[in-house]
A protein has these predicted regions:
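Short, well-ordered beta-strand segments
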Residues: 19-23, 118, 158-161
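Conserved AMP-binding A3 loop
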Residues: 118-142
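Conserved structural elements of the adenylate-forming
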Residues: 1-4, 133-154, 159-166
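Conserved G/P- and acidic residue-centered "switch" motifs that form tight phosphate/ATP-binding loops
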Residues: 20, 41, 126
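Structural core segment of the AMP-binding/adenylate-forming
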Residues: 4-12, 39-101, 108-111
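Conserved short alpha-helical elements in the N-terminal third of ANL/AMP-binding
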Residues: 36-40, 158
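Conserved AMP-binding/adenylate-forming core of the ANL superfamily
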Residues: 1-27, 31-35, 52-57, 137-138
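Conserved pre-ATP/AMP-binding loop-to-beta segment of ANL
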Residues: 105-122, 129, 152-158
Length: 166
């Protein structure tokens, strides 16, 4: 799925250094986008679905995404946000699945790499406007490796994440 998403994003003009925002509750698409972005050198920008339209519009203006993916339950506001941000918006679901169905990318293709920036996560903004904290692939990999060792995880383990993915 990540390979098809990476190829589909590239076919829509998303490339190295571009940002793709995702506005959805916890959804497998968030992980698919994260791994797809890592392949093409793009950055994922997860949005806090608890924020007001005004706060989201500010974050999108700050992040300057090339594209907005959104969950069906946010379709009403997402169209306005995408228009305000000047980027296309695509609803997560069967239409997006069908659009990328014909795409594929070999694992070794794409400009993504360990030194590439991978995600922009916004702080809570307790002292002012939220700030976009940029996370590199290497930092996220190091975090995953530390978790793997700290919890003695094996390929047979499953992880339940109850936290929001923004």
């Amino acid at each position: 799925e990540a390979a098809r998403m990476a190829s589909w994003l590239a076919s829509r003009g998303v490339g190295s250094g571009d940002r793709v925002a995702i506005y959805a509750r916890n959804h497998p698409e968030s992980f698919i986008l994260l791994f797809a972005a890592s392949r093409i050198g793009a950055m994922m920008v997860p949005l806090n679905w608890r924020l007001s339209e005004e706060e989201l519009a500010w974050q999108l203006a700050d992040a300057a995404p090339s594209m907005l993916l959104y969950g069906a339950d946010f379709a009403g506001i997402a169209g306005k946000l995408a228009s305000h941000a000047g980027c296309p918006g695509f609803e997560i679901g069967t239409k997006l699945d069908a659009a990328r169905e014909s795409h594929g990318m070999e694992a070794e293709e794409g400009p993504g790499g360990p030194d590439a920036e991978l995600m922009v996560v916004y702080t809570s903004g307790t002292t002012g406007r939220p700030k976009g904290a940029v996370l590199a692939q290497a930092a996220m990999r190091a975090n995953a490796e530390m978790s793997h060792h700290a919890y003695a995880m094996t390929p047979d383990d499953h992880v339940l994440n109850i936290l929001p993915l923004f």
